[in-house]
Structure formats: C-alpha cells, structure tokens
Design a protein with these regions (language model features):
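Conserved beta-strand hairpin/beta-sheet module of binuclear metal-dependent hydrolase folds
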Residues: 1-43, 138-150
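A generic "binding-loop/recognition-motif" signal
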Residues: 9-10, 32, 56, 80, ...
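Metallo-beta-lactamase
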Residues: 90-93, 122-213
Length: 213
C-alpha cells in the first residue's frame, strides 16, 4: 500500500500494489492529477483500475485525467452513479471554497452486489455503509489485514452526516455491523487523516464507545 495526500482538504489517494508487474488499483484520485501521475511513474506502477469509496468532489477531482491517461476502468457503487456527472450531487457546486466544479464521465463498472469481488489479482470484500453518503462502500482485504474505508470512519471520529443523503444513525449502525466486527488488528485506511486499527477505534473513538451521540 502506498498513499499520497492531495487537495485542499487533504484527501488520501491510495495505491494498492500487487505482485504481478506492479499492477495497481488507485482508490479515490481526489485532486492533483500531476502528483498522482508522478507517483505512478516514479514507482513504476501499472494502473489497472480506479475504485471509488464514494463520489464526493474531494475524492474524484483527478479521476478523469487518470482514467484517460492510463485507459483504465472506473468502479463505483451504482447508488451514486449520477454523482460524477452532477456537481450538485458530488458537492463541488455547493461549496464556495471549490473554485471549479468536479465532473467526470460515468463509471465503467458498477458494483451490483456487495460481498466478495476480484479485480485482477486483487481479492477483497465490499460492504455498503451509507450515512456519510448514500453509496459509501468499504473494501476489506481480510487476507492482508486491512480495509480501505473512505470517509466512513477516521482515527478518533466518523464521517460527516450533515450532508445531503447523510444519516448519523445509519452510519453508526453500519460501522458497528461491518467495521467493529473485524479482527482488532485490522488496519483502517481512511479518506482523510492517519491510519488506525479496529481495536484502537473500539476503545478510543467517542462515536463508538457511547461518549458522543
């Protein structure tokens, strides 16, 4: 796993690197396409896909540039299929601090069912955890002991639920069902901020231990 932080609100773009010829899945290319391309070239990576945890503007800003340069498919939860096309839905038209709206073509592949999935050599499990956004999806790599969780959960916090389509109760229910039940040593890679573990969040995250509702 390799990551760079991009954009004004410091979004984490992840590069999941395989064993076969540096095949790489890019998760959430949020901004600064030139920096993402530089990371790919400097590390001799071979992109094979872009995967979105969700389609808020800060996670999709470099999507179209990267897709076109490397001619690779974009994978997405179909609940948010219109969000790449609509700056009102992805939030870029509603945020006065975003100078340009974020637009992209429709995704190439939609995750029609949650559960086990494969892209090339990569095997993982998907779970739908709405609440921050309607289509938020986490990607669990059980064999490798980590999960890419987007803006569902952070170190010491959880995703915003005051955005359109958000629900704090639904978000916490999903985290309790799909995140808290993972092995404690599972590393969580969030959309913003530092990695954490399931165990650390169970014991210290105020949104999970009842201190904050």
């Amino acid at each position: 796993m390799y990551a760079i932080t991009v954009g004004p609100i410091q979004e984490n773009c992840y590069f999941l690197i395989g064993d076969h010829e540096n095949d790489t899945i890019i998760f959430d290319p949020g901004e600064q396409a030139e920096d993402i391309i530089a990371a790919i070239e400097e590390n001799a990576l071979h992109p094979i896909a872009i995967v979105l945890t969700h389609a808020h503007y800060d996670h999709i800003g470099a999507l179209e540039t990267i897709r076109e340069k490397y001619d690779i498919p974009v994978y997405q939860n179909p609940i948010e299929r219109e969000w790449l096309l609509d700056p009102q839905l992805n939030g870029s038209a509603r945020n006065p601090n975003v100078p340009d709206v974020r637009l992209a073509k429709e995704a190439d592949v939609f995750f029609e069912e949650m559960g086990p999935y494969e892209i090339g050599e990569f095997r993982f499990e998907m779970q739908h955890i709405p609440g921050h956004s309607p289509g938020s999806t986490v990607f669990i790599f059980r064999e490798n002991g980590f999960a890419i969780v987007g803006d569902v959960i952070f170190k010491g916090s959880v995703g915003r639920s005051d955005l359109p389509g958000g629900s704090h109760e639904t978000l916490i229910e999903g985290i309790q069902k799909y995140i808290v039940t993972l092995p404690g040593e599972t590393v969580l890679f969030p959309g913003h901020g530092d990695p954490t573990t399931v165990r650390e969040e169970i014991y210290s995250n105020p949104y999970l231990n009842g201190a904050t509702r």
